[in-house]
Regions:
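Gly/Ser-rich helix-loop-strand patches that form or flank binding pockets
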Residues: 98-145
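Structural beta-alpha unit
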Residues: 74-107, 145
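Intrinsically disordered or low-complexity boundary/linker segments at protein termini
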Residues: 1-17, 79, 131-145
Length: 145
């Protein structure tokens, strides 16, 4: 049994399976689960130094919406509020950093996201599999968990 599980979610259908797998790894003890959602920077992929204020406002709004959605997503699972993280940055990098900060034993992540992010989350899972300092459990889209 793992004592600290970091579950990375993107609000896809697979995310519920990720959380269910995390619960199983902790014998249904939500106090051992840390939940993270990473928001990509609004300016990622652009080299724009103009309109930074507008992008910052958009990014702040995206973080607020993601945080509210994350709270709603986990509301029935009773994960402590101080163990729920909404961060901005590179998905794999932020998940690894949070994993190190909380000294997680395992990361649970979906192997595919939703819509246009399907390939990106696959890339994130791959980066974590090859760069994490702890165990990584990937939950495939469509797994009945």
């Amino acid at each position: 049994m793992y004592t600290k599980v970091l579950a990375a979610v993107d609000f896809s259908e697979t995310s519920r399976s990720v959380l269910n797998a995390a619960l199983r790894l902790t014998n249904d003890n939500p106090s051992r689960i840390h939940l993270i959602h990473v928001v990509q920077p609004v300016t990622e992929g652009y080299d724009l130094k103009v309109y930074t204020e507008n992008f910052q406002a958009l990014e702040d709004e995206a973080v607020e919406q993601a945080a509210a959605r994350l709270k709603e997503f986990e509301s029935s699972d009773k994960i402590p509020a101080d163990q729920i993280y909404t961060v901005v940055g590179d998905r794999a990098g932020e998940i690894r950093r949070t994993c190190a900060d909380i000294e997680a034993d395992v990361i649970v992540i979906g192997s595919h996201g939703y819509s246009g992010q399907r390939r990106m989350l696959g890339t994130t899972a791959n980066k974590l599999l090859h760069g994490a300092k702890c165990d990584v459990l990937t939950v495939h889209a469509g797994d009945p968990t």
